[in-house]
Regions:
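N-terminal redox-cofactor-binding region of secreted/periplasmic oxidoreductases
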Residues: 1-190
Length: 190
């Protein structure tokens, strides 16, 4: 969806996007708290790992989206960027343009962060990011408190300067609905 959006910025381009699954019309896709109801349905590939020796040879279920927007239409909507060290390692291996400092401007350009304003986040981009205060519960607050009491530092912005620590989750939600890559990048250019 992101690539289709970017390619469509040039009016000389005609873009065809093929999706293996169907449209993202299933009601549970739009309702943030209903995401688990999408597992093992027609919008899920239903992948499993090979038998895993460390868990008594069980196969581990891997839900993956099979609908417009892919897994961004079926996952738990947590917005977590890759770790700085991973991007820098890719660049060190010869992948020019993939260092953290080189990809950060693209994260910023894509993002519309509702709460955080600093040099690591964007405003006005197509991908909405929020703390989704409706999901803030006493249990979530107790979890963060327990982590801090056990030596894990609180990190109010794990998509910022430092990723380590405990935090409430940043979500891809807008107006109390899932904000998938299809909603953010594809539907605006259809």
């Amino acid at each position: 969806c992101v690539l289709a959006n970017r390619l469509s910025e040039d009016p000389a381009n005609r873009v065809l996007l093929l999706e293996a699954g169907g449209p993202d019309k299933k009601m549970e896709i739009q309702i943030p708290a209903a995401y688990a109801k999408l597992n093992r349905t027609e919008v899920d590939w239903g992948f499993e790992t090979e038998p895993q020796p460390h868990v008594l040879n069980r196969k581990i279920y891997l839900p993956r989206g099979k609908t417009l927007g892919g897994s961004s239409s079926t996952n738990a909507m947590a917005y977590v960027r890759g770790n700085r060290a991973d991007y820098d390692e890719w660049a060190a291996l010869g992948n020019q343009g993939w260092s953290y400092e080189e990809v950060l401007p693209y994260f910023i350009k894509s993002e519309n962060n509702e709460q955080i304003t600093n040099s690591y986040h964007g405003k006005g981009g197509p991908l909405n990011v929020t703390y989704a205060t409706a999901f803030r519960t006493p249990v979530a607050d107790a979890f963060v408190k327990a982590c801090v009491e056990n030596g894990i530092p609180e990190n109010d912005d794990y998509n910022g300067a430092e990723q380590a620590g405990t935090s409430l989750v940043q979500f891809n939600i807008k107006g109390q609905k899932r904000w998938s890559t299809a909603a953010a990048f594809l539907k605006p250019v259809l």
